């Protein structure tokens, strides 16, 4: 049975967008390292953000759905690329807002993520 995938992105566009997103997250983490103990590791299709050596935020590619998923100790989110931004299909929140809220919640520190840090 064929999956119903209404996302019009071509697979190469999807990978380009997610790779850019992962790079931007890494750059943002570098800028926040002075504020709190935060770093990240890239493993295949997964970016793991380590917070205060005790918590993690995990972001991974869901290629077959052309989505990115974000998992925290509090919740899980599925994002689709809509109108040039990643939007949660449940909460309708922008990816960057959810990422920032999740990191602040897990560290109790003011962490700022910017879509464009240049």
UniProtKB/Swiss-Prot annotation:
Keyword Iron (UniProt): yes
A molecular function (GO) term: ferric iron binding
UniProt keyword annotations, A-Z: Iron, Metal-binding
Keyword Cytoplasm tagged: no
Source organism superkingdom: Bacteria
HAMAP family per record: CyaY (MF_00142)
Function comment: Involved in iron-sulfur (Fe-S) cluster assembly. May act as a regulator of Fe-S biogenesis.
Sequence similarity: Belongs to the frataxin family.
Protein's recorded name: Iron-sulfur cluster assembly protein CyaY
Lineage: Bacteria, Pseudomonadati, Pseudomonadota, Gammaproteobacteria, Enterobacterales
Annotated gene: cyaY
């Amino acid at each position: 049975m064929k999956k119903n995938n209404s996302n019009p992105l071509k697979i190469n566009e999807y990978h380009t967008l997610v790779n850019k997103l992962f790079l931007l997250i890494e750059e943002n983490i570098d800028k926040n390292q002075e504020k709190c103990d935060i770093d990240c590791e890239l493993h295949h299709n997964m970016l793991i953000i380590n917070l205060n050596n005790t918590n993690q935020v995990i972001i991974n590619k869901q290629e077959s759905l052309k989505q990115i998923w974000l998992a925290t100790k509090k919740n899980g989110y599925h994002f689709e690329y809509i109108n040039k931004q990643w939007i949660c299909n449940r909460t309708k929140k922008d990816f960057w807002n959810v990422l920032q809220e999740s990191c602040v919640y897990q560290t109790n520190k003011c962490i700022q993520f910017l879509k464009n840090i240049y």
